[in-house]
Amino acid sequence: MIFPSVKEQLDIIVNNTVEVISTDELERKLTKSLKNGTPLKIKLGADPSRPDLHLGHSVVLRKLREFQDLGHEAILIIGDFTAMIGDPSGKSKTRPQLTAEEARENGKSYFEQASKILDPEKTTICYNADWLSQMHFADVIRLSSHYTVARMLERDDFEKRYRSQTPISIHEFLYPLAQGMDSVHLKNDVELGGTDQKFNLLVGRDLQREYGIEPQVCITMPLLVGTDGSEKMSKSLGNAICFNDTPEDMYGRTLSIPDSLIETYWNLLVPHHSGNDKPIAERIAADPRETKRELARELVAQYYSAEEAAKAQEHFDRVIVNKQAPTDLPTVEFEEATMPVVELLMALAAFPSKNEARRMIQQGAVQAGNEKISDINAVIELTENPVIIRAGKRKFFKVARAKKSF
């Protein structure tokens, strides 16, 4: 295996990281790897607490891809066992525990989604239940003896909960130990994670040392702020842009980020800036709107294609900017001649509930043809001539009465 020089590798690896523990150790590992012609083992774990990956996950996945491109071995761990514990990192209360079935089901699509960034041919995928579920209670007791309660309470989230008398369950103390055992089992050289994973990564480093294994280098990456501009990107907070979003949704949600996040998103999410040598900060200062549109096109092109990115932009301009219906709407036909507006919206799955539908009607967010509907008891007349129903900013439906057959 031919690797780039140690300096070249370090420059790429350290770029955009928050912390490397430690750079000297990483340099020694890279030097040994180069001398022996053997790749380093790079570990990244992901608990399948939800079935969708979002752009926040892509930050560490891109760093793992950089290691792949440098010739090293990428190991992606699907934490189907640790997901049953629930990672307490950054949480102010105990997380719900998943069943084994839920964890496995959520994990099924993780590798497929991660392969939009990683090279699947050069990625080793593991499920940590394969080794953690084999441990006996005596093994857990021996493992627990390597760490103290005082050491656990050093982590910020546990310390805050302890001082505020918010309950901390014993199984939460076991989470970093279980994640650390992944590193003991794999004997990996490097582990990647977000800044909220620092404590867990360091536990893995300590446990490797305790078990006579050369300690891993820990590399932390920034946590991506979500579209709301304030909280860490999270599906549960509604501020996420997901890998599996439609091209139109991905484009629109990217344009919804505050201008203050454009540079961060560019640096963390776009590996190669597209044919423009001007520094991104200068481009944002000159024309933030166009730079954000370019960012949105870049992201859609990464996860779909340049053609889909162009279509997504055209859709956004037509529907959001010019407030016109999409040109490719299928017609949804109903047998009824009239329908109460709330029932019609529910039949179209325009909103998740009747209460939400009523609220949106009262806010003036529902339109039939050119007429804004403000009465929640309004009745929509359906004829064989289709009418466009607009629900919210981005949802359009073409509805008509089914033609009678004789």
UniProtKB/Swiss-Prot annotation:
The keyword Ligase applies. GO terms for cellular component: cytosol. It holds the Pfam family tRNA-synt_1b. ATP binds at K235. Keywords: Aminoacyl-tRNA synthetase, ATP-binding, Cytoplasm, Ligase, Nucleotide-binding, Protein biosynthesis, RNA-binding. One of its GO terms (molecular function) is tyrosine-tRNA ligase activity. InterPro entries: aa-tRNA-synth_Ic, Rossmann-like_a/b/a_fold, S4_RNA-bd_sf, SYY-like_C, Tyr-tRNA-ligase, Tyr-tRNA-ligase_bac-type, Tyr-tRNA-ligase_bac_2. It catalyses: tRNA(Tyr) + L-tyrosine + ATP = L-tyrosyl-tRNA(Tyr) + AMP + diphosphate + H(+). A motif ('KMSKS' region) lies at residues 232-236. SUPFAM superfamilies: Alpha-L RNA-binding motif, Nucleotidylyl transferase. Residues 339-401 form the S4 RNA-binding domain. It comes from the Bacteria. A motif ('HIGH' region) lies at residues 48-57. GO terms for biological process: tyrosyl-tRNA aminoacylation. The keyword Mitochondrion does not apply. Gene3D superfamilies: HUPs, RNA-binding S4 domain, Tyrosyl-Transfer RNA Synthetase. Signal peptide: none annotated. Belongs to the class-I aminoacyl-tRNA synthetase family. TyrS type 2 subfamily. Homodimer. This is Tyrosine--tRNA ligase. It comes from Chlorobaculum tepidum (strain ATCC 49652 / DSM 12025 / NBRC 103806 / TLS) (Chlorobium tepidum).
